[in-house]
């Protein structure tokens, strides 16, 4: 049989979907499962956005668009990024794709060369596709550790130590998946200072959760002197407007926009025209629903953090953004005799019917950081209350058995 490429062997997956398959299998068997696995809003896309898509269908907007995206969307995205970040972005700086995720690959392809030892620094724990794409594109992944003591940010001094002449790209994600951490302004300023001393490094700023900040204003690296020109801003419709299935994202960088356009031409041709017109309405239309979703997430965050900290053996920091918590379950693992977070996760699913993700689903476990699991609180208050109660009961019951 013909062989499969080594590049394909390097390609990983999103473990959230692996766990979701486990959950669906249990559901088919009639099990009662409360799931906190998937990182997508549990709201419908706002009606005005739905109506814009319906109009596009009825108006016959069914064909290809320019690979960079329709002008109306690039204009709307440029205005949105300029206003929300306090920077100057032009429509020609914008490229649209079928979701924000393709720009991870396009950015690595545009800034590194295959097999030459080019390095990409990325956050760990982090979105698993970062490391997967770095390896598959023939670059070397260099993790920078997020620490609980820093509210799940990294030490800028560690960044400076990790940059080498081979470093080509730095991936930043704030607010962050999986921890909900935010890079504070003082650290972002320190990162900018470090990058000024290392002009050979590009930056991929994954800002898909930019509108889901709860403690203070969102800070983008592009707001600091000299950073806009070398930063790829990546955003989209999925998280802010509950458009995960519409597959619509966009990136901005003046120098790389023509390169990204060629990659889109060679891979996707273009994003769905219907989704693009829906995104125009998302950016230009009323924002009441988006603000309402954000307020709901904030209330849920406060609820799940409070309840988690009442569970035996669990401590949970308050995340600054996104819709994830990253509770420390080190003591809980000891209490029930679980070797690590993955064993805890599996037992929690099979014995208590609560589905979460383990820290190892987001990269190698950070040394000396203990055991963690991820909750997505894109779930109802009732689900949060019942799910955390089940986890508490699970720990108490198994603690008694261990004793």
Language model features with spans:
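Active-site phosphate-binding strand-loop segment of PLP-dependent enzymes
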Residues: 142, 146-215
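N-terminal "arm"/small-domain region of PLP-dependent enzymes with the aminotransferase-like
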Residues: 1-63, 354
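Conserved PLP-anchoring active-site segment centered on the Schiff-base-forming lysine
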Residues: 110-134
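Conserved glycine-rich beta-strand-loop-beta hairpin in the small C-terminal domain of fold type I
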Residues: 280, 296-305, 316-332, 371
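Generic structural signal for small/hydrophobic residues in well-ordered secondary structure
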Residues: 19, 36, 53, 77, ...
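Conserved core segment of the aminotransferase class I/II
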Residues: 224-298, 302-311, 394-395
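PLP-dependent enzyme catalytic core of the Aspartate aminotransferase-like
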Residues: 161, 337-338, 347-356, 362-403
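Phosphate-binding glycine-rich loop
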Residues: 57-63, 74-119
């Amino acid at each position: 049989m013909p062989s499969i490429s080594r590049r394909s062997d390097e390609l990983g997956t999103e473990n959230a979907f692996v766990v979701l398959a486990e959950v669906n299998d249990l559901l088919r068997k009639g099990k009662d499962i409360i799931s906190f696995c998937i990182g997508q809003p549990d709201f419908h896309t706002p009606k005005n956005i739905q109506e814009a898509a319906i109009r596009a269908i009825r108006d016959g907007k069914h064909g290809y668009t320019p690979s960079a995206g329709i002008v109306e969307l690039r204009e709307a995205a440029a205005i949105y990024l300029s206003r929300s970040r306090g920077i100057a972005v032009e429509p020609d700086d914008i490229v649209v794709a079928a979701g924000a995720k393709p720009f991870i690959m396009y950015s690595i392809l545009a800034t590194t060369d295959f097999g030459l030892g080019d390095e990409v620094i990325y956050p760990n724990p982090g979105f698993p596709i970062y490391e997967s794409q770095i390896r598959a594109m023939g670059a070397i992944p260099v993790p920078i550790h997020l620490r609980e003591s820093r509210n799940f940010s990294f030490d800028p001094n560690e960044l400076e130590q990790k940059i080498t002449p081979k470093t080509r790209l730095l991936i930043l994600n704030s607010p962050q998946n999986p921890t909900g951490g935010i890079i504070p302004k003082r650290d972002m300023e320190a990162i900018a200072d470090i990058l000024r001393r290392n002009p050979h490094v590009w930056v991929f700023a994954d800002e898909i959760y930019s509108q889901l900040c709860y403690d203070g204003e969102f800070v983008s690296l592009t707001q600091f002197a000299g950073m806009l020109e070398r930063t790829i801003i990546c955003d989209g419709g999925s998280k802010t407007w509950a458009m995960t299935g519409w597959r619509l994202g966009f990136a901005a960088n003046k120098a790389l926009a023509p390169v990204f356009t060629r990659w889109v031409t060679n891979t996707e041709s273009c994003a769905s025209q219907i989704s693009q017109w829906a995104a125009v309405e998302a950016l230009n239309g009323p924002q009441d629903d988006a603000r309402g979703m954000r307020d709901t997430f904030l209330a849920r965050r406060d609820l799940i953090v409070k309840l988690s900290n009442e569970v035996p053996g669990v401590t949970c920091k308050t995340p600054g953004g996104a819709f994830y918590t990253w509770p420390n379950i080190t003591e809980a693992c000891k209490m029930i005799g679980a070797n690590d977070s993955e064993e805890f996760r599996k037992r929690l699913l099979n014995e208590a019917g609560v589905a979460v993700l383990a820290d190892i689903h987001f990269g190698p476990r950070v040394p000396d950081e203990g055991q963690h699991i991820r909750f997505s609180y894109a779930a109802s208050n009732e689900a949060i209350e019942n799910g955390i109660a089940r986890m508490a009961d699970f720990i108490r019951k198994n603690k008694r058995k261990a004793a």
